[in-house]
Swiss-Prot record:
It is a multi-pass membrane protein. The lineage of its organism: Bacteria, Pseudomonadati, Pseudomonadota, Betaproteobacteria, Nitrosomonadales. HAMAP family: UPF0391. Keywords: Cell membrane, Membrane, Transmembrane, Transmembrane helix. Belongs to the UPF0391 family. This is UPF0391 membrane protein Tbd_2772. The chain crosses the membrane at residues 1-21, 28-48. Pfam families: DUF1328 (PF07043). It comes from Thiobacillus denitrificans (strain ATCC 25259 / T1). It is found in: Cell membrane. One of its GO terms (cellular component) is plasma membrane. InterPro entries: DUF1328.
Length: 55
C-alpha cells in the first residue's frame, strides 16, 4: 500500500514539474488516500495482533 502511495507521489511531483496541475493534484490526492488507508491497516493489524489468544 505504501509502495503505491510513493508511486503516486512521484507521479504527482513529475506532473507538477511538467506543468500538468490537474494530474498532479489528482495523483497527490490518490497518494494521500492510499497512505491513510495503509496507515489505518497497519494500526488495525497492530491492535488485532495484541489480543490474547482465546481458548
Amino acid at each position: 500500500m505504501f509502495g503505491w502511495a510513493i508511486t503516486f507521489l512521484v507521479i504527482a511531483i513529475a506532473a507538477g514539474i511538467f506543468g500538468f496541475a490537474g494530474l498532479a493534484g489528482t495523483a497527490a490526492w490518490i497518494a494521500k488516500v492510499l497512505f491513510v488507508v495503509g496507515l489505518a491497516a497497519v494500526l488495525i493489524m497492530l491492535v488485532m495482533g495484541r489480543r490474547p489468544p482465546t481458548v
